[in-house]
Amino acid sequence: MKIEDNFSFQNNDVIVVGCSSGPDSMALVDMLLKIRDKYQLCLVIAHVNHNVRKESYEEAEYLKEYCDLNNLLFESMVIEEYGDDNFHNEARNIRYNFFENLVKKYNANYLMTAHHGDDLIETILMRMVRGSNLNGYSGFKEVVLMDGYKIVRPLIHYTKQELEDYVKENNVKYYVDSSNDKDKYTRNRYRKYLLPFCHFIQNKIPH
């Protein structure tokens, strides 16, 4: 599994990498580390502490130590309070505002996130149930052109299981967000109950 299979890097690219310390984003960081010297990449690891779990401070500290050990730039923020809006939407808006500020600070070419194939399926299913138009059925794009930079999701061709296998095979330490198991969040319910069924059906289709 090589990130170069899905994206063409250029020498001296500056990349802001959204990283939660979970298996998906740690896989992304590890893949980028493996090619950093080849392309002389400048990697800025961006972490947002959502401040909803007591373990989140331990995770942030681990990620800082990991970045120090690997000579990676590390930037972090803590969300001190939320409004009354949808939690996931509000957290996402805060994250991307933070990422965009870092892109400007470092004059980055790219913002990379660890969204994978399962995330894409979840998004499509949620939009279908909510009555999205045909454009919504395509989910999110692998590359999005922004003002002066691009958002890139280079892991979109892999499943979550493949990324979990990757971090275990490469001995990459990661943390698991326990809040992902809570049924009160809509996306979690899709992830726990609908996605396994989709994979089951997919495995039954002759290839």
Name each model feature, range by range.
Residues M1-Y193:
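Core alpha/beta nucleotide-donor-binding catalytic domains of modification enzymes
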Residues Y185-H207:
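ATP/NTP-dependent adenylation/nucleotidyl-transfer catalytic domains that generate, transfer
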